[in-house]
């Protein structure tokens, strides 16, 4: 039986999602909990919709795994949450078709990036939003964002060490909204390259402080050079918010 689960996690104390020797990761905690539940000495492989970096959070990460256990789907969150640490939670579980794949069946992903613009740092927000106290022109940020919507080669907006050859991606939605303590960026797309969302956020913040003009974003895309784009915003402001599937 293949099970599809939606999970959330606080990325602050994790070295990212993917298993790394000697480091605490989300995947490692999930697979350890499943091994206990299955009374197995071997790991139960877990597949996710995608990896998140160190410090990055998830409100709606999706995973799948295969199991011989006959636990009803609605009981799986209770069973796993009893074994998982407090910074990971299974929100929902459902039986999936054998052909379902958490990564390859996804048709769209949504990320959000949170910025708080208060004058002084807030110790209670320091792991969950980016402190950016400069005055921001939100309209310029929105104008700059328009150049990124659509299908483009995002070479300039991914880490230089990215090994993926095809860097063409489609951005469906990209906007900034004002919150009680700052701003929130919402972005949806067909998929994202390594550090792509963080570089987009950092570049649009540069537009907000007047470091670049909104129209310069177009030339950044055309340059196909990481050095042409703006800063990489820190990981702790980023959340994998939702993963969308056809069914």
UniProtKB/Swiss-Prot annotation:
Q: Does the keyword Isomerase apply?
A: yes
Write the record's keywords in alphabetical order, separated by commas.
Answer: Isomerase, tRNA processing
KW Kinase (keyword) present: no
> Which residues does the entry assign to the active site, renumbered to this chain?
53
Annotated InterPro entries = PsdUridine_synth_cat_dom_sf, PsdUridine_synth_TruA, PsdUridine_synth_TruA_a/b_dom, PsdUridine_synth_TruA_C, TruA/RsuA/RluB/E/F_N
Question: Which enzyme type, at the first EC level?
Answer: isomerase
GO terms (molecular function) for this protein are: pseudouridine synthase activity; RNA binding; tRNA pseudouridine(38-40) synthase activity
* Biological process (GO), any one: tRNA pseudouridine synthesis
Q: Which reaction does it catalyse?
A: uridine(38/39/40) in tRNA = pseudouridine(38/39/40) in tRNA
Tell me the residue numbers annotated for binding substrate: 111
State the SUPFAM superfamilies in the record.
Pseudouridine synthase
Q: Where are the transmembrane segments?
A: none
User: Which EC numbers does the record give?
Assistant: 5.4.99.12
What is the role of the protein in this entry? Formation of pseudouridine at positions 38, 39 and 40 in the anticodon stem and loop of transfer RNAs.
Family statement drawn from the similarity comment of this UniProt entry = Belongs to the tRNA pseudouridine synthase TruA family.
- Subunit composition and interactions: Homodimer.
Q: What is this protein called?
A: tRNA pseudouridine synthase A
Q: Which organism is it from?
A: Bacillus subtilis (strain 168)
């Amino acid at each position: 039986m293949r099970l599809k689960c939606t999970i959330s996690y606080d990325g602050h104390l994790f070295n990212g999602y993917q298993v790394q020797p000697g480091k605490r990761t989300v995947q490692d905690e999930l697979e350890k909990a499943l091994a206990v539940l299955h009374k197995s000495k071997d790991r139960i492989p877990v597949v996710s919709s995608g990896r998140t970096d160190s410090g990055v959070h998830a409100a709606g990460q999706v995973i799948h795994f295969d199991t011989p256990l006959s636990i009803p789907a609605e009981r799986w969150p209770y069973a796993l949450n009893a074994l998982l640490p407090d910074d990971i939670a299974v929100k929902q579980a459902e039986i999936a078709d054998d052909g379902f794949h958490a990564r390859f069946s996804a048709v769209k992903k949504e990320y959000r990036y949170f910025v708080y613009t208060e004058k002084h740092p807030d110790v209670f927000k320091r792991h969950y939003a980016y402190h950016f106290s400069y005055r921001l022109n939100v309209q310029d940020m929105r104008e700059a964002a328009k150049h990124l919507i659509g299908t483009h080669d995002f070479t300039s907006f991914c880490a230089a060490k990215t090994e993926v050859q095809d860097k063409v991606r489609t951005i469906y939605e990209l906007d900034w909204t004002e919150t009680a303590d700052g701003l929130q960026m919402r972005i949806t797309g067909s998929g994202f390259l390594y550090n792509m969302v963080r570089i987009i956020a950092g570049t649009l913040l540069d537009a907000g402080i007047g470091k670049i003009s909104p129209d310069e974003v177009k030339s950044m895309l055309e340059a196909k050079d990481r050095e042409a784009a703006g800063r990489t915003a820190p990981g702790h402001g980023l959340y994998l918010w939702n993963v969308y599937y056809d069914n």
